[in-house]
Amino acid sequence: MSTTQAPKRYSPLWVTLHWIIALLIFAAFYLGLSTKDIPLVEKVGILRWHMPLGITVLLLMIVRFVVRWRTPHPEPATAGNALLDKIGEWTHYLIYVFAILMPLTGLVLSATFNLAPVVFGGEGALPRDLSPMLHGLIDPILALLILLHILAALYHQFIRKDNLLARMWYGK
């Protein structure tokens, strides 16, 4: 019986998806936060970019799940501590959940308030404040999870010196 060994790094497709999704999420965060405390007319222009970014993140996250199921990937990194390893595992799961919930709640928000004709067609008016909606409440949770993910990667790279970042980059 032969067993296959897990690869040392993620596939180029996986790496590409990771970094594109990360950039899109940061851009969507920036644009979403830019809509706070500005006139409604200016919000429409920002939402013209923010909404398609969110939909793109959702679609790429679906592709990412398919790639995850169909391609071999490295074993989870270890922090040398069972509790930290479990926190890392759950942080990854929760990032996936919230990275999908964020655009889904954005779509629900858009459908509920019929935002597409307002944002893309210039017909109608935006509601005064959308931030208390579920979409706005998920925002800080996802941001905190991403911050935790980044700090953990830096911990591995510079304190544990296990070259973890090489797993999520191109190379042999």
Language-model segment annotations:
Residues 1-172:
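Membrane-embedded alpha-helical bundles that constitute the cytochrome b-like, heme-associated redox core
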